[in-house]
Curated annotation (Swiss-Prot):
Reaction(s) this enzyme catalyzes, per UniProt: ATP + H2O = ADP + phosphate + H(+)
Subcellular location per the Swiss-Prot or TrEMBL entry: Cytoplasm
All copies of domain Helicase ATP-binding, residue ranges: 40-219
Keyword field contains Hydrolase: yes
EC number: 3.6.4.13
Protein name in the entry: ATP-dependent RNA helicase RhlB
Phylogenetic lineage: Bacteria, Pseudomonadati, Pseudomonadota, Gammaproteobacteria, Enterobacterales
UniProt entry tagged with the keyword rRNA-binding: no
Species of the source: Escherichia fergusonii (strain ATCC 35469 / DSM 13698 / CCUG 18766 / IAM 14443 / JCM 21226 / LMG 7866 / NBRC 102419 / NCTC 12128 / CDC 0568-73)
CDD domains hit by this protein: DEADc (cd00268), SF2_C_DEAD (cd18787)
Gene (UniProt): rhlB
Function: DEAD-box RNA helicase involved in RNA degradation. Has RNA-dependent ATPase activity and unwinds double-stranded RNA.
Gene Ontology cellular-component terms listed: cytosol
């Protein structure tokens, strides 16, 4: 298979419903990515699919295309009631559910199928109002879905298509019991089309597929290496005292168009935000305790380009699909090897190149050997001159103003480059 982002296979080559093809082409989707080219022949034949592919490989459009085609090509279950959706798409996080819904909207507009969205945090009555009018495809997180189901606001007895996205993260976040609860209220596996997608097809994910799917076909799209060949990786060994100044110096050197900085704790993220906001960067903060409306606003501002930098924890950033991220900074090396892959996979997406910079400090350097074993290669090491690090830095801000940061728009050139040769 070609290692380029797109294959020679076109959506129009498949026997897809004409309205689906029209909607795809209107949005500029003509050629399939590898995961789409593997999945569509199976789902169009009514086969269940368990797919492994990294983030940014087009798996969302693979299962949305399959879902819309299936519902348009098969009649609804007889005597279906208004509170019975025909398809259910489960996601591990609110943000991912919202983004899947946004990706599905052009297809819904073109086909007339109705979408519903269900996630926790806020919007309970607003989401419920949409559900009460009847939806064909319901996208949501498991907790809110169970809440609606227990109150009979939704009934899963007419489900014809099920999608489980980022199944490995469902396990990591402890949602597997919720998933099984929802599956038990659906028609049997052989009476519906089932799709599962995951960054890793581990034993536990395969076990779930065996339990809840109908003889699923396993498909995998493996890059040359786990971290993707379009991502330039770089590693520094700072002392704890120099770590923050090194980060700020690297940001001045790289001057990223759009960057995500990962840290292992909420407190550390807030500290980074305070330093960067004080230095005039347009920076947003995304941690688990940020209110849902604010989270969505921050993501929207970052996606639009109103913010240049996003500081986030792993939990807060899981499942996010943000285009054109040029740089990822691992301020802390993650404790989980898979989190390293997920983090740097935020850049180098959709055929673009990206740059990942990791800081192996005294506290987290012990995580490095396991990460390098997992990704199958050593991360190239770069050196820096401690005497050249930035020193003229303002006092960091504290979280007494909106976390989205209101630093002035960056203008002009960055400060002088300070990395040693």
């Amino acid at each position: 298979m070609s290692k380029t982002h797109l294959t020679e296979q076109k959506f129009s080559d498949f026997a897809l419903h004409p309205k689906v093809v029209e909607a795809l082409e209107k949005k500029g989707f003509h050629n399939c990515t590898p995961i789409q080219a593997l999945a569509l022949p199976l789902t169009l034949a009514g086969r269940d699919v368990a797919g492994q592919a990294q983030t940014g490989t087009g798996k969302t459009m693979a299962f949305l295309t399959s879902t819309f085609h299936y519902l348009l090509s098969h009649p609804a279950i007889a005597d279906r009631k208004v509170n019975q959706p025909r398809a259910l798409i489960m996601a591990p996080t609110r943000e991912l559910a919202v983004q899947i819904h946004a990706d599905a909207e052009p297809l819904a507009q073109a086909t007339g199928l109705k979408l519903g969205l269900a996630y926790g945090g806020d919007g309970y009555d607003k989401q419920l109002k949409v559900l009460e009018s009847g939806v064909d495809i319901l996208i949501g997180t498991t907790g809110r879905l169970i809440d609606y189901a227990k109150q009979n606001h939704i009934n899963l007895g007419a489900i014809q298509v099920v999608v489980l996205d980022e199944a490995d993260r469902m396990y990591d976040l402890g949602f597997i019991k919720d998933i099984r609860w929802l599956f038990r209220r659906m028609p049997p596996a052989n009476q519906r089309l089932n799709m599962l997608f995951s960054a890793t097809l581990s034993y536990r994910v395969r076990e779930l597929a065996f339990e809840q799917m109908n003889n699923a076909e396993y498909i995998e799209v493996e890059p040359e290496q786990k971290t993707g060949h379009r991502i330039k990786e770089e590693l520094f060994y700072p002392s704890n005292e120099e770590k923050m100044r090194l980060l700020q110096t690297l940001i001045e050197e790289e001057w990223p168009d759009r960057a995500i900085i990962f840290a292992n704790t909420k407190h550390r993220c807030e500290e980074i935000w305070g330093h960067l906001a004080a230095d005039g960067h347009r920076v947003g903060l995304l941690t688990g305790d940020v209110a849902q409306k604010k989270r969505l606003r921050i993501l929207d501002e970052f996606t639009r380009g109103d913010l240049d930098i996003l500081v986030a924890t792993d939990v807060a950033a899981r499942g996010l699909h943000i285009p054109a991220v040029t740089h990822v900074f691992n301020y802390d090396l993650p404790d989980d090897c898979e989190d390293y892959v997920h983090r740097i996979g935020r850049t180098g997406r959709a055929g673009a190149s990206g740059h990942s910079i990791s800081l192996a400090c005294e506290e987290y350097a012990l995580n490095l050997p396991a990460i390098e074993t997992y990704i199958g290669h050593s991360i190239p090491v770069s050196k820096y001159n401690p005497d050249a690090l930035m020193t003229d830095l303002p006092k960091p801000l504290r979280l007494t103003r909106p976390r989205t940061g209101n630093g002035p728009r960056r203008t002009g050139a960055p400060r002088n480059r300070r990395r040693s040769g």
